[in-house]
């Protein structure tokens, strides 16, 4: 059986570029454990240029091949691609649209599901339509006096708020606000990251995460894991990835009643199926002191860095990551 030429595409144009490279390391190591794949790692930079790990400039053409700037190098045909890109253009659905156009099979959620989940406003509309509880919010489409007034009213009503750029990941463009004098500046900053902004009520709760993925034709939801931060610490980009971070994770959250855990998993599967996700996701919830469950967000290409929860939860559930990738890829190619 001939090997599969697999393009591992990483990087991208968002603030999560470097995190995507770390995740790609995990994918590359996992794929190397199988003899089925010829893997070519290509970095997409912030200017849309492609370069191999060896430093060769190249491009992905509509003939489903990698063509090198050095014309003495033969083109490399691509059978399958893993778009290991957090943020734009990976989780936004943009690059998936291009893969669809050139009929190149790819790993992960399709373009519409990616776009719907990445935009926090669209996602919350879907959560509500599916009957899944989520945090109270308002959304804003421009930075003006009315937006400032609405946000200040929300702060007065809720006591504490989060202001979030609607289309960013990893807590980029996300701010906790307790002081009305900071509202205008925070809104201005958030609108610098995205044309739409969402304002959410601050929820004092545990942060639980579920890995949801397809395995041998079934949608699997793991037991919830937990992100544990210092008291009153917001899980910022730096808290997630900085060496000085004091946050820690439990692959299986402790002291969660069985019925609550099962309800969280049921909501996670309902969101996965209802929003037509594919292959993998990480679905994040809040659990309040009163055991109220609130869906926070869906990540359609969860991180796979050394500290990331998705691969840990998958493995804790009894599944090998390399075998999981092989099953997905071979199943998809066989169905062509």
UniProtKB/Swiss-Prot annotation:
Give the Enzyme Commission number: 6.3.2.4
* SUPFAM superfamilies tied to this protein: Glutathione synthetase ATP-binding domain-like (SSF56059), PreATP-grasp domain (SSF52440)
- List where in the cell it is found: Cytoplasm
Which amino acids does the record list as binding Mg(2+) 1?
284, 297
| Function text | Cell wall formation.
Can you say what this protein is called?
D-alanine--D-alanine ligase
GO biological process annotations for this chain's record? cell wall organization; peptidoglycan biosynthetic process; regulation of cell shape
Cofactor section: Mg(2+); Mn(2+)
Top-level enzyme category: ligase
Q: Which InterPro entries match?
A: ATP-grasp (IPR011761), ATP_grasp_subdomain_1 (IPR013815), D-Ala_lig_Van_CS (IPR000291), D_ala_D_ala (IPR005905), Dala_Dala_lig_C (IPR011095), Dala_Dala_lig_N (IPR011127), PreATP-grasp_dom_sf (IPR016185)
- One family name in Pfam for this protein: Dala_Dala_lig_C
